[in-house]
């Protein structure tokens, strides 16, 4: 899980979702998991 100021899709499997006010990137590749913070 990477915590970044700007979350971006890294590959075509990445999806941007908003969970309880937090922007996250979910992906099949675990290295691509990101959270805005």
Curated annotation (Swiss-Prot):
Family as reported in the entry's similarity comment: Belongs to the bacterial ribosomal protein bL36 family.
Biological process annotations from GO: translation
Keywords: Ribonucleoprotein, Ribosomal protein
Keyword match Ribosomal protein: yes
Any one Gene Ontology cellular component term annotated for this protein: ribosome
Protein's gene: rpmJ
Keyword field contains Ribosomal protein: yes
PANTHER family per UniProt: 50S RIBOSOMAL PROTEIN L36, CHLOROPLASTIC, LARGE RIBOSOMAL SUBUNIT PROTEIN BL36C
Entry GO MF terms: structural constituent of ribosome
PROSITE patterns for the chain: RIBOSOMAL_L36
Name of protein: Large ribosomal subunit protein bL36
Organism of derivation: Shewanella baltica (strain OS155 / ATCC BAA-1091)
S-S bridge residues: none
């Amino acid at each position: 899980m990477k915590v970044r100021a700007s979350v971006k899709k890294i590959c075509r499997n990445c999806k941007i979702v908003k969970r309880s006010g937090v922007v996250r990137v979910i992906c099949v590749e675990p290295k691509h998991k990101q959270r805005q913070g």
